A protein has these predicted regions:
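C-terminal motif of bacterial Sec signal peptides marking the signal peptidase cleavage site
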Residues: 17-20
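Short, glycine-/small- and polar/acidic-enriched structural segments
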Residues: 29-190, 195-199, 203-207
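Small-molecule pocket liners
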Residues: 138-144, 236-240, 244-245, 325
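Secondary-structure end/capping motifs
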Residues: 250-333
Length: 363
């Protein structure tokens, strides 16, 4: 989710890794492993992957069934990591993208999902050293919701807009492109209950395509979604970052982590209920499985519908990152686009495929 947050305390960073997690030897609930230790790699590759030690993976937000969160959870539950001789520990992230990036840069975690390329660029601009190795959605996940009576965004002038602490930069750009005078829109911070919109407390509400609209639809409420991409605003979702030193020393392990994740992604497309049950097992209490199945299916559609022709699932390309970086410069989010050769690893995911077929097992 494109939150573009940059501040986090050292205490919060340390506290994250004290939360409950799934350790490398504790498979989760809905899925049953079908392989065996090392069954998908050579003995030499198995030894190399084991030499990488435990890989700590931090989710983007708790155990939500989002792209780049549900698939690693399922990869572990299905035994795919074990098939590749990888020991993976899953930690729930808080949703603070800066926190995830700092954990990875420090080597406290080796891999993490992060909201999108924009969040990577903001963190790198703030001196956080990470590498982006994969990306799933080539579209912003943010949306702006209104009642159906709003037929033109300029109608929002003189009304109240609810946001979660900051107006997402993609939403701001959309409104400006539509000619909205933001000085004429009152912005208020609201919580995560989207019914504030249908109850008339706000006249527009920021959210995520895979979350608040689903909640409102389940309550029988009809809203209009205004999406940044319809106004030419670039964006992305579900980017995977890794620690640079770990990537240099254990590139094969990073490749195989992503290989298992991509295999699990395809599995979850056909077995959403089972994969969400794996996430629910990790969450343990208060997990809305029906809603999370919808989250996964919505994000999967966004990922598949936005996949550029000629690219494979998970591929991150430098040109798209540059386009997003140029946009962030124009919006005043970063001073300049960093040297992308030191940020993006565009060849890693394509190397896992033979044409459009994921290579499994590893030769």
């Amino acid at each position: 989710m494109n939150r573009l947050r940059t501040a986090v305390t050292a205490g919060a960073t340390a506290a994250l890794l004290l939360t409950a997690c799934g350790g490398p030897d504790e498979p989760a609930g809905g899925s049953t492993p079908t392989g065996s230790r090392g069954s998908a790699v050579t003995q030499e590759r198995c030894r190399d992957n084991e030499a990488a030690g435990t890989i700590t993976y931090v989710t983007g937000f708790q155990y939500q069934a989002s792209a780049s969160i549900l698939d690693p959870i399922a990869a572990r539950a299905l035994g795919y990591f074990d098939d590749l001789c990888l020991d993976v520990e899953i930690q729930p992230g808080t949703g603070e993208t800066a926190q995830n990036a700092q954990l990875v840069a420090a080597g406290t975690a080796q891999v993490s999902s992060i909201a999108g390329n924009g969040d990577v660029l903001v963190n790198v601009a703030n001196g956080v050293d990470v590498r982006a190795v994969a990306m799933f959605g080539h579209v912003p996940v943010a949306t702006l919701m209104t009642e159906p009576t709003t037929t033109d965004l300029k109608q929002l002038e003189g009304t109240t807009l609810g946001q979660k602490g900051a107006l997402p930069v993609t939403i701001e750009a959309m409104l400006r492109t539509a000619g909205v005078d933001l000085a004429q829109v009152t912005q208020v911070v609201v919580g995560y209950d989207p019914t504030v919109l249908v109850r008339g407390q706000v006249q527009s509400l920021t959210g995520y395509k895979s979350n608040e609209p689903l909640t409102l639809a389940a309550k029988g409420e009809e809203v209009t979604q205004w999406n940044p991409e319809d106004y030419g605003v670039p964006g992305s979702m579900a980017t995977t970052i890794v620690n640079p030193r770990f990537l240099t020393e254990h590139r094969g392990a990073v490749e195989d982590f992503l290989r298992a994740q991509l295999k699990a992604y395809a599995y979850c497309e056909e077995h959403a209920d089972e994969c969400v049950a794996d996430a629910a097992e990790l969450s343990q209490a208060g997990y809305d499985t029906d809603h999370n199945v919808q989250v996964w299916q919505t994000e999967d559609r966004l990922v598949r519908d936005s996949l550029p022709a000629g690219q494979v699932l998970g591929q991150i390309d430098e040109a798209a990152v540059r386009t997003e970086g140029d946009f962030l410069v124009r919006m005043g989010q970063i001073p300049a686009v960093p040297d992308l050769s030191t940020v993006v690893v565009p060849d890693l995911v394509p190397s896992l495929y033979d044409g459009d077929r994921l290579v499994w097992p590893v030769p």
